């Protein structure tokens, strides 16, 4: 379409205006000038835009006299559309040129015209100019499920978990035997993705019944939907992108906890402690080892205290129960624990000293430790020193999937070589007093860990200062254990040949062990020690750090932390 519009001025009008310049412009001159400068109406512009949108090739002449609705025309409408903004204007903006411009425009399918000055204008077709009054089309299903479907799924998951829990656990047998691997998929281990404000690490565990009663007894307590929401699922049904975090509580404690009210952590730990005290005479000392893994970062210190008080029975001993029933620790049933934190607390190893429980009285605590230590010393005295090789082999077999790295070749570490992941805790743990011969616990960015043994070996007259001293001094429950508690063995039997500082360092660790028992320990296993060495242990409570002049005390470190 060839549109020819009048130019900037008409020759006759110019001549006429010049001849009558002195007399002024007449009325007909003004009307003639207004007719010459043609301003198209919005209807004409709209029709022109529709015609241009339908033609694939259009020849347009843009004179400078063509006026289109600009952005400054507030609330100006064309066919009910607001043309105050450039987005809604169906007309291209014109540049103020002195002469007309001939342009060949190829209209695209999307009806967007690119002007000669670089601007773009969207030509709205009839379907867009007259929008339908029908409601919006249905949006594609999003990733967020509907609330009704979510509630239904939660209710179904809760009913499924309850039916699984009310079914009698046929895989539970006597704890002295080896439970089959199906016991690991028992619904005692239920995932709880959302973190709770208060810790509920042992919501279905720690019953105070005899282990033999579990063979014919199912879990009768109902689940509390307020504690676990509706998102519980067995760990066998967990999706691959969800990490199911569990804690290993033995089967002998997993039955009848009162669920009339939400159980408090301190009351649960107190019941476990009483149960451990009742079973103090039985050699299965690992029953009371509260192996709590992956504590919640909200209450990590509470869980550390809980694991400390759970392992109240843990005494410096080579753990004879691990040799008798080594598979009992591996196939122990899993219990519910909030899976919110990336911190892996070493199971059975607490960084809070067990000499200071928060809820228990120190007198009963010391008596309990005294009874255990005397009993375990009597057991250890009947075992000759060459018999440690059998325990050595059993300790190597124990290093299964639960342990990271190779199993250290130490006879005392059958139960103590626990997993230790170097993940930074979200909250600093409580530093332990230097009961293991260190000057102070070192505050690393990822926790109070101990320095490697080979970084701080001091050259002493009795050592070769080559870094080959592997002192078998495990750190269990906040108290150093080692060779002095084996009464029948030689003082340096557990140290490598060629290290001369072994017996002296073990005596120093022994003194601190006696000091940590608050002086109430009966010196039954230490008759060969002199009274002068024992007098070093009775120091003031605030003066428990070893002497800085005792350089050999810096060697005693836990080899499982290296």
Curated annotation (Swiss-Prot):
Disordered: annotated span: 155-203, 219-245, 537-562
Q: Which InterPro entries match?
A: FAM222
Q: Output compositional bias ranges, type Low complexity.
A: 155-167, 183-201
Name the GO cellular-component terms: mitochondrion; nucleoplasm
Q: Which family does it belong to?
A: Belongs to the FAM222 family.
PANTHER family referenced in this protein's UniProt entry, alphabetically: PROTEIN FAM222A-RELATED, PROTEIN FAM222B
Q: Name it.
A: Protein FAM222B
Organism (species): Homo sapiens (Human)
Classification of source organism: Eukaryota, Metazoa, Chordata, Craniata, Vertebrata
